[in-house]
Structure formats: C-alpha cells, structure tokens
Swiss-Prot record:
Family, similarity comment: Belongs to the aspartate/glutamate racemases family.
This protein's UniProt keywords: Isomerase
InterPro entries, A to Z: Asp/Glu/hydantoin_racemase, Asp/Glu_race, Asp/Glu_racemase_AS_2, Asp_race
Protein's name according to its UniProt entry: Uncharacterized protein in pnlA 3'region
Domain of life: Bacteria
GO MF assignments: amino-acid racemase activity
Pfam family, one: Asp_Glu_race
Gene3D superfamilies: 3.40.50.1860
NCBIfam families to which the protein is assigned, alphabetical: asp_race
Length: 150
C-alpha cells in the first residue's frame, strides 16, 4: 500500500520498512529476527521485503509474540522493569537461534532494550533510528540553503 500511496502523493515519502531493510542489506546480514507488534509481524511487511534480498527473517512463536505485546503494554503503562523482563527472554531466544541482528520494529522496543542496544549495537537495527537518519540525509541532500548548521 505504501508504494501506491507514494505514487499518488506529490510529497517525498520515505518508507521505514525500506530504510530498515536497506540497513540490514548493507550490513551483509543474512539472518535477522523481528521484534514488532503482532499486526506488523502478521502483515509480513518486513519479511516480504527481506526475502527479495535472500535474507531470512525469524519471528517469535505465538507465545513469545504475546510476550512482546505484553512488554509493549507494560512499558506504555510505566512498568519499565516488567517490560524488560518480558522482552529480554524473547530477544535472547532469537539470538540463540542464530540471528545476526534483531529489527526493533516498534518505537517502544529500543527503549525497553536500551541497555542492550547501547552495549551490543551490532545485534540491533532500530527501525525508527533508520528512518530518522534517512530523513536527515534527505533534508541535507535537498536543502538549497547552505547556511543551515546541523
């Protein structure tokens, strides 16, 4: 649906899915895990994009996906420690299964796993961060005024 919308829109649009998958591809990663909302996982928007580049995308089983959602809800309700205790084992199982990187495909997930992202950044791709980087790059590429400092 994104590409259809993009074709009908005059404004430049950047896809969070595309920029995240490009980051995975440029890292020469072939096995990734996906932590995201159930709707995102079931829609297969990351998986279908990655498969075109022969990148295997692993998702949590139903029980673990339920824990991901409970973790997100816990974080939103202010239970940071509870959110971490729910999400950390799911993340560990993906890494133990041999994924090279984990896509953090929901804005709360990098916050819940903040310590791990900071200490082991090689294991994570934060979709929101990838979108921000691409947006800033786009701005400076398309900015005609040379006097704006970053």
């Amino acid at each position: 649906w994104f590409n259809d919308l993009k074709q009908q829109c005059r404004a430049e649009m950047i896809s969070i899915i595309d920029v995240t998958c490009q980051a995975i591809k440029h890292a020469n990663t072939t096995r990734v895990g996906l932590l995201a909302t159930t709707a995102t996982v079931k829609a297969r928007i990351y998986q279908d994009n990655l498969i075109t580049d022969n990148i295997d995308c692993y998702t949590p089983d139903d029980a673990d996906q339920h824990q991901v959602m409970e973790s997100i809800y816990a974080y939103k309700s202010g239970d940071i420690a509870g959110a971490y205790s729910l999400l950390s084992p799911v993340k560990d199982r993906l890494l133990q299964a041999g994924v090279e990187k984990i896509i953090l495909g929901c804005t709360e997930l990098p916050l819940i796993l903040e310590q791990e992202v900071r200490t082991s950044p090689q294991h994570y791709v934060d979709a929101t961060e990838e979108l921000i980087k691409k947006t800033v790059e786009w701005y400076f590429t398309h900015n005609t005024r040379n006097n704006i400092a970053a």
